[in-house]
């Protein structure tokens, strides 16, 4: 389970930038819940509008490598203000706590690499089920994810046939396989169940443009309903307003595109 760091952010995310955004929660209900999943109780953060008429459209928010820290919680609050029930499950909770790692390389090797994709996808199924029992509309299920969660977002779009729409922010597209990660997004382009919007950056040294073009070609070959937008002046994690690489113009445009994607493909109110 993710513990609370004094700043509200994982230590490996330091240094923090002064551009970080905090969304007030006066118009929303937000907090921590526990979701039964595969014999365990998975912690999750949720946010929803206080005033709602019937079941809410659902957005599962998938964490960055840093876990469900303050930025991901704020993403949930922003989505709640847009009328969604947003849930961010702590998908590392069985393997460890990201707050125990002081830097990104040890966080990746000591925790993130130990989390099996199959476990994550099954956990997300339980999140969707929890949402449908707690004020969410099972027929309007969406997902978005950032960095590590961006890759998972692509995979989940190929995993869950009930998903209506997905938006993946700067998630890895190609790479070496392992027992825990047997496939990458490029491998499942033919299997997408829902329209996927990918938001990427031209200056991302961890996701080169060659891999983005490889994914585009795979999507075209599969005739998949998907779109990839590249922001030429932005780097990796351009939406992470708490980090020095935050690129405000790209982040704002990406956020608006995400909302429009959800509105277009997210399903009709029952």
UniProtKB/Swiss-Prot annotation:
Under catalytic activity, the entry for this protein gives: 2-(5-oxo-2,5-dihydrofuran-2-ylidene)acetate + H2O = 4-oxohex-2-enedioate + H(+)
Q: Does the keyword Hydrolase apply?
A: yes
Q: List its EC numbers.
A: 3.1.1.45
Catalytic residues identified in the record: 147, 204, 236
Task: Output the InterPro entries linked to this UniProt entry.
Answer: AB_hydrolase_fold, Dienelactn_hydro, Dienelactone_hydrolase-like
What is the similarity comment for this entry?
A: Belongs to the dienelactone hydrolase family.
What name does the UniProt record give this protein?
Answer: Putative carboxymethylenebutenolidase
What Gene3D superfamilies does its record include? alpha/beta hydrolase
Sorted keywords for this record are: Hydrolase
Q: Name one GO molecular function term.
A: carboxymethylenebutenolidase activity
What is the protein's species of origin? Salmonella typhi
């Amino acid at each position: 389970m993710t513990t609370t760091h004094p700043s509200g952010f994982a230590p490996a995310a330091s240094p923090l930038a002064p551009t970080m955004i905090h969304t007030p929660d006066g118009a929303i209900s937000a907090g921590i819940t526990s979701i039964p999943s595969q014999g365990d109780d998975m912690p999750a953060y949720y946010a929803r509008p206080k005033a709602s008429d019937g079941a809410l459209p659902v957005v599962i928010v998938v964490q960055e490598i840093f876990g469900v820290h303050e930025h991901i919680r704020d993403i949930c609050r922003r989505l709640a203000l847009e009328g969604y029930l947003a849930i961010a499950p702590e998908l590392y909770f069985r393997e460890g706590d990201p707050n125990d790692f002081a830097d990104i390389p040890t966080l990746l090797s000591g925790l993130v690499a130990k989390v099996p994709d199959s476990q994550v996808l099954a956990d997300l199924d339980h999140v969707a089920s929890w949402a449908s029992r707690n004020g969410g509309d099972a027929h309007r299920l969406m997902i978005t994810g950032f960095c590590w969660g961006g890759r998972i977002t692509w995979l989940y779009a190929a995993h869950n046939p009930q998903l209506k729409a997905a938006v993946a922010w700067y998630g890895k597209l190609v790479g070496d396989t392992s027992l825990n990660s047997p496939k990458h997004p490029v491998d499942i382009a033919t299997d997408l169940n829902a329209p996927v919007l990918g938001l990427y950056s031209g200056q991302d040294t961890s996701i080169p443009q060659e891999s983005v073009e490889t994914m585009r070609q795979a999507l075209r070959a599969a005739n998949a309903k998907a779109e990839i937008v590249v922001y030429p002046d932005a780097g990796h994690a351009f939406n992470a307003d708490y980090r020095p690489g935050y690129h405000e113009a790209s982040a704002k445009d990406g956020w608006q595109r995400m909302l429009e994607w959800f509105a277009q493909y997210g399903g009709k109110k029952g």
